[in-house]
């Protein structure tokens, strides 16, 4: 007798549910996607005990026809696909017809639904079987209640994290959906407390203000761009709002949230040296494309996708982010409102580096599974100044459009103190900003975008009434200022009518020299300096194999390495722009970079060499300068392409506005 047999439907559904329904947030995601696909304009999500006890999703979408109710909980029963070709033209968020069947096999489900001009219906499903089907009073749309999740698969409950973690994952999903569908009013309520309530205005920047707070929202920069195959639209936050993990990066394709390593890399390359090591930006990017260019049928959660013409999209994202910050004033304003806790001791640089590397290793191990506890629990919780997560607890009031006052009041992470929030002029200005935001990003008109940023950035940076915006004269991105002196032989102090400035002299010269060396390394030049006595380098056999493979790449950065017999190589000339006293050291460092990587990306090699040379040749800390030397340094910095951060992403200049200084000394209350 044969051993192979077909599994019972209930058992097969439980197995399938393990792929689709991983945790409570998976249920929320699937039901929310169904509501959006049904054309809903209002969606309410209510959870109890972080969704373990119950999840209820109510929408005003099209509803389910009475004759379809018998099929709705069957596996692979869907209205979104009809034939094979449809799989390559998917525009809906769901399409497999697996979600409801999987959910009902591991939970108790009650569904009420009603379509236009029809009577409502209610069905109750347990263990995948419809136990009750009756007429019921219902509004147009669908009301689905999921209770006792994993009641019949207790082993799954053991792997549920803390309720706080599960709520964080639910919040993450709902917030991302709200960003990608700003035209839908979405409310998330946990145990009777409102976690999120959007107004459905259609403006993504307003949703981001609700999620991240007004301080971040005011510093969002709009990006938009096209190729023959792609259109991208989104917002990128200024570098000062960077975070310690990459989960604040939100990428959508045709409204679907996705994770993609190459697109993440494109965003980071767009920011380039504006971010320090271990810091990641806040950004939202939606990519519109023909569905035939993307395969979303790769992973059960539909988070992973495969893209055609990925390199073209990569370059588009990089160029648009770079354009967004080009010629823009990015001097971060000092935050005097934050006072560290008394028992909080700053770690040494070495300790911070160790912690960062440990965190990176952990994140890299978890990235493929998308199940990192950090990944979904942290992103869209509001952070306070200590990078601690704070869950806002508003009273339950779904679908209520928040006024500008309430948006400001909710911004617990903004860093403004109570004294200033009581100032009537300040509130008036914030109201004007929000009203301006309401009218700004409806078009791609650069003038309207710049006008908004001119007004919104008044509190961000005070200089020449062009705060945080593009400067017509690039040399005026660094304001003219009077040199006052120097602190600890490291920081230059300057002032003008708008306040005080601190300039890191090492970082400033590092930026200047980096741009010089970067351009020189990229030049093809015949101007070389011959050596009377060639430099000799000795390498092991395995090192020789690598060097011989990449001799041409070394020539592209000016190093003519010749085999001299045995394990020896010589260099008899070098580019004239090499510092004479460091020729041997620079060549050694270049070769070591190649030996370390065991491969060569010529662009990265030039970048690494330029950073290395600029760091070594720059003024160090505890080096005292004369006033004219400080002035010359700032004048040179003013000529730089990106004068606000060093090549490692650290800030070069910080502004203390006159108001902030007066507040520090209690001259204003």
UniProtKB/Swiss-Prot annotation:
Disulfide bonds: none annotated. Keywords: DNA damage, DNA repair. Residues 356-377 are annotated as: Disordered. GO terms for cellular component: mismatch repair complex. GO terms for biological process: mismatch repair. Residues 361-377 have a biased composition (Polar residues). InterPro entries: DNA_mismatch_repair_CS (IPR014762), DNA_mismatch_repair_MutL (IPR020667), DNA_mismatch_S5_2-like (IPR013507), HATPase_C_sf (IPR036890), MutL/Mlh/PMS (IPR002099), MutL/Mlh/Pms-like (IPR038973), MutL_C (IPR014790), MutL_C_dimsub (IPR042120). It holds the Pfam family DNA_mis_repair. One of its GO terms (molecular function) is ATP hydrolysis activity. Belongs to the DNA mismatch repair MutL/HexB family. This protein is involved in the repair of mismatches in DNA. It is required for dam-dependent methyl-directed DNA mismatch repair. May act as a 'molecular matchmaker', a protein that promotes the formation of a stable complex between two or more DNA-binding proteins in an ATP-dependent manner without itself being part of a final effector complex. HAMAP family: DNA_mis_repair. PANTHER family: DNA MISMATCH REPAIR PROTEIN MLH, PMS, MUTL, DNA MISMATCH REPAIR PROTEIN MLH1. This is DNA mismatch repair protein MutL. It comes from Staphylococcus aureus (strain MSSA476).
């Amino acid at each position: 007798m044969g051993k192979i047999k077909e599994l019972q439907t209930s058992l097969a559904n439980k197995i399938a549910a393990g792929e689709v329904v991983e945790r409570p947030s998976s249920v929320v995601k699937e039901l929310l996607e169904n509501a959006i696909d049904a054309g809903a304009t209002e969606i309410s999500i209510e959870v109890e005990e972080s969704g373990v006890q119950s999840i209820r999703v109510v929408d005003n979408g099209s509803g389910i026809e009475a004759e379809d109710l018998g099929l709705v909980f069957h596996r692979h029963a869907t209205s979104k696909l009809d034939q094979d070709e449809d799989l390559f033209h998917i525009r809906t968020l769901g399409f497999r017809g697996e979600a409801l069947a999987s959910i009902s096999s591991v939970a108790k489900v009650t569904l009420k639904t009603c379509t236009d001009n029809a009577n409502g219906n209610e069905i109750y499903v347990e263990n995948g079987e419809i136990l009750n089907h009756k007429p019921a009073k219902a509004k147009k749309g669908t009301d689905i209640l999921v209770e006792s999740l994993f009641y019949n698969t207790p082993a799954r409950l053991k792997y549920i994290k803390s309720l706080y973690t599960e709520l964080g994952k639910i919040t993450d999903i709902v917030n991302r959906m709200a960003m990608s569908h700003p035209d839908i009013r979405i409310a998330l309520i946990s145990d009777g407390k409102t976690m999120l309530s959007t107004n459905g205005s259609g403006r993504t920047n307003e949703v981001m203000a609700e999620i991240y707070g007004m301080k971040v929202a005011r510093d969002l920069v709009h990006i938009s761009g096209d190729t023959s195959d792609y259109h991208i639209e989104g917002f990128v936050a200024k570098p000062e709002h960077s975070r310690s993990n990459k989960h604040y990066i939100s990428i959508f394709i045709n409204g679907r949230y996705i994770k993609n390593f190459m697109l993440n890399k494109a965003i980071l390359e767009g920011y380039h040296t504006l971010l320090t090591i271990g810091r990641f930006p806040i950004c939202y990017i939606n990519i519109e494309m023909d569905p035939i260019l993307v395969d979303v049928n790769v992973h059960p959660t539909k988070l992973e996708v495969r893209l055609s013409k990925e390199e073209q999209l990569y370059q588009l994202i990089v160029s648009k982010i770079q354009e967004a910050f080009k010629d823009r004033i990015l001097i971060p304003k000092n935050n005097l409102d934050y006072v560290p806790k008394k028992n909080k001791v700053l770690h040494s640089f070495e300790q911070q580096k160790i912690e960062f590397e440990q965190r990176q290793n952990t994140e890299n191990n978890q990235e493929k599974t998308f199940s990192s506890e950090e990944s979904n629990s942290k992103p869209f919780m509001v952070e306070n100044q200590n990078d601690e997560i704070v869950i806002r607890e508003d009273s339950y009031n779904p679908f209520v459009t928040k006024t500008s006052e309430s948006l400001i009041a909710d911004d617990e992470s903004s860093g403004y103190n109570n004294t200033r929030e009581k100032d009537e002029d300040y509130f008036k200005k914030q109201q004007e900003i929000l009203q301006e935001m309401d009218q700004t990003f409806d078009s791609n008109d650069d003038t309207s975008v710049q006008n908004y940023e001119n007004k919104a950035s008044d509190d961000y940076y005070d200089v020449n009434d062009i705060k945080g915006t593009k400067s017509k004269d690039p040399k005026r991105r660094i304001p003219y200022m009077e040199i006052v002196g120097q602190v600890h032989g490291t920081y230059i102090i300057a002032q003008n009518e708008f306040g005080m400035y601190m300039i890191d002299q090492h970082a400033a010269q590092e930026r200047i020299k980096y741009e010089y060396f970067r351009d020189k390394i990229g030049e093809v030049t015949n101007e070389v300096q011959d050596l009377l006595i060639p430099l000799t380098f000795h390498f092991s056999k395995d090192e020789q194999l690598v060097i011989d493979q990449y001799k041409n790449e070394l020539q592209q950065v000016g190093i003519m390495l010749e085999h001299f017999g045995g394990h020896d190589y010589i260099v008899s000339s070098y580019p004239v722009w090499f510092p004479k006293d460091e020729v041997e050291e620079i060549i050694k460092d270049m070769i070591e970079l190649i030996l370390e990587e065991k491969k060569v990306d010529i662009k990265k090699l030039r970048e690494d060499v330029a950073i290395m040379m600029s760091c070594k040749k720059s003024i160090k800390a505890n080096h005292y300068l004369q006033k004219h030397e400080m002035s010359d340094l700032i004048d040179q910095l003013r000529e730089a392409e990106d004068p606000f951060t060093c090549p490692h992403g650290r800030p070069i200049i910080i502004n203390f506005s006159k108001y902030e200084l007066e507040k520090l000394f209690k001259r204003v209350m």
